[in-house]
Amino acid sequence: MASDYGDEAGGKLLDWMLRIGLEAGAEAMARSARELSERLAGIRGTIAGGRAEAIAADGVSTYAKLSLEELSGLPEYATIKEVVSDKLRAASVEHHIIPGEGRDWLLFKVEDAPEVDEAFRQLEQETGKAADRARERLSEIAERRQAPERLAERAERAREASRAHSQGIGRDRGPRQIEGPER
């Protein structure tokens, strides 16, 4: 790495910055996962408490309208809406996410409220599991970053194998034709 920067200091500075970035990213990821989980729990409370706004047709509450405002302040809100929609679709819940009054609303049939609540419960649990898997992957990346000698060793073995191949070492071990009995 010294050749990239002229001396070892530049390489060490880059490594330091990458470690800081990985740590900051891991902290931001954990914070966002925690916030998402808490907000999903809050939305579940709204569903379970019957506080979703009912929309009546012919005097009968047919649809419920649930504010997604709690989720809107999270990073990658558009992705979160897609995740919610995908989870509801997988549960065969007919729904729509509609914009309105400065916030998005989840529109679903009142009779599907238990399935909607269950979908949000599953998302709440899956958020923690996904955060754990992401932390593991970040740790793996950090380990690979801290162990460049393993990569250098593999590169050296590949160079040796390439040299051996180009020098013809082992070329006489190719497939041979075996003659069968004469007829």
Question: What do these predicted regions represent?
Answer:
Residues 1-91, 98-183:
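Positively charged, small/polar-rich N-terminal and surface patches that mediate targeting and assembly
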